[in-house]
């Protein structure tokens, strides 16, 4: 059975802040772990529009991409929905008969899409690129890496003491030394800066499980910006490793201007309150922007999600009732109740209404939403439509259907 490559997950894009309390240049150290082809400087390479891998953004301002396994075959099919003409087309088909695993899409801002592949015995790690003009090419990587960010030129892996770079054109992996002690998670990227968290403790984290947990009790979770081009790390803010009051850790949702947005679930008696936080990079302050109890909120579509246009966060889905989405618009700080219907709430998938769930935001200000079904390989799958953002937030369901691809 084919499986996804164990690539590290990340969340959505976010911005470079204009000011931050700390800035340190990473000292030159000997990189550990993976054996790379050579030691380089970050300044030796071009930097494009950085994105986080698996940030739920298989899209650009002009197109939305999906992957699916073709029923009864070993084929992996890639589809592209062009926002301009509202037509979904097939852009790739890969026969995975001789491959053991593969990654999700790596979609760059220039609408080039890539997939990582590995054979069954793990002896070969490669990637295939698909270009807007219909060309495709496959390259073997000089070594296996687990990319967490990428741009038009390369994919990157970040470690405590080094950064590895896989060149899309050559397949070569090079490294430079870095100092990102006890890196915990990659949260997102924007303007060529990577937002991440680090564990800050009084002592190095031990390998013994009980001692490890004991150290974490008195540790901090620090939110930082790492600049790939200058190899510098800046602190944003920190909080206890285990949030006070039993709340969840803050999940990054996206940015608009100097404001970074985070979602958090906070216990409130027998209930839970959903809290939206904003970190103002220019002021260096963290503030509560909106809070709402989750009483009566449920639904198959329940994971908070941010939607961006040209990298800027336009709106956030917070939570839902049975037939309404609660959506926060960053431009004015208002919450809108938007009608939708999620088929996962019904006993039989495909036999009920399916509309209004946001999928992506186009560069010209329209929302891609679910709207009914199409049959694919004998099974129902979501159909899509487009609607103006302001009309969508006002409750309109006057959708314009797109032309979904059908297998011949």
Task: Give the location of each predicted region.
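N-terminal, intrinsically disordered, polar/charged segments of Gram-positive cell-envelope systems
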Residues: 21-69, 76-82, 86, 90
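Surface-exposed loop/turn elements that mediate protein-protein interactions on large endomembrane-trafficking
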Residues: 38-48, 73-95, 120-141, 161-179, ...
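Short beta-strand elements that form the blades of beta-propeller/WD-repeat-like
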Residues: 56-71, 104-119, 147-159, 164, ...
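Positively charged n-region of N-terminal signal peptides that target proteins for export
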Residues: 1-4
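Repeated scaffold domains used in trafficking and secretory/extracellular systems
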Residues: 49-60, 98-109, 141-152, 180-191, ...
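Conserved active-site beta-strand-loop modules that form the wall/rim of enzyme catalytic pockets
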Residues: 223, 251, 258-262, 274-277, ...
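C-terminal motif of bacterial Sec signal peptides marking the signal peptidase cleavage site
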Residues: 13-16
């Amino acid at each position: 059975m084919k499986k996804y490559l164990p690539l590290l997950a990340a969340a959505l894009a976010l911005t470079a802040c204009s000011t931050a309390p700390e800035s340190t240049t990473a000292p030159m150290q000997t990189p550990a772990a993976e054996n790379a082809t050579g030691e380089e400087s970050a300044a030796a390479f071009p930097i494009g529009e950085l994105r986080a891998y698996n940030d739920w953004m298989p899209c650009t301002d002009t197109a939305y991409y999906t992957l699916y396994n073709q029923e009864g075959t070993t084929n992996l099919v890639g589809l592209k929905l062009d926002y301009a003409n509202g037509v979904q087309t097939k852009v790739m088909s890969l026969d995975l008969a001789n491959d053991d695993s593969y990654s999700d899409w790596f979609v760059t801002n220039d609408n080039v899409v890539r997939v990582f592949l590995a054979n069954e015995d793990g002896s070969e790690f490669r990637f295939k690129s698909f270009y807007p003009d219909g060309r495709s090419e496959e390259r073997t990587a000089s070594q296996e890496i687990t990319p967490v960010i990428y741009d038009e030129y390369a994919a990157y892996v970040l470690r405590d003491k080094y950064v590895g770079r896989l060149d899309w054109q050559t397949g070569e992996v090079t490294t430079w030394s870095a100092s990102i002690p006890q890196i915990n998670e990659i949260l997102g990227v924007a303007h060529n800066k990577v937002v991440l968290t680090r564990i800050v403790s009084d002592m190095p984290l031990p390998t013994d499980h009980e001692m490890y947990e004991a150290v974490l009790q008195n540790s901090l979770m620090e939110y930082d910006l790492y600049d790939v081009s200058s190899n510098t790390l800046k602190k944003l803010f920190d909080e206890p490793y285990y949030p006070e009051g039993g709340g969840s850790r803050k999940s990054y949702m996206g940015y608009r201007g100097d404001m970074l947005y985070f979602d958090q679930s906070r216990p409130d008696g027998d209930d839970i309150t959903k809290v939206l936080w904003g970190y103002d990079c220019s002021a260096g302050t963290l503030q509560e922007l909106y809070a709402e109890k989750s009483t009566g909120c449920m639904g198959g579509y329940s994971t908070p999600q941010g939607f961006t246009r040209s990298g800027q966060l336009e709106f956030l889905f917070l939570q839902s009732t049975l037939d309404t989405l609660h959506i926060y618009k960053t431009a004015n700080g208002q919450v809108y109740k938007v009608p939708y219907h999620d088929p996962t709430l019904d006993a039989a998938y495909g036999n009920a209404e399916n509309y209004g769930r946001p999928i992506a935001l186009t560069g010209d200000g329209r929302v891609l939403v679910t709207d009914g079904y199409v049959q694919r390989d004998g099974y129902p799958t979501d159909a899509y439509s487009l609607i103006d953002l302001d009309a969508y937030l006002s409750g309109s369901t006057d959708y314009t259907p797109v032309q979904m691809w059908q297998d011949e």
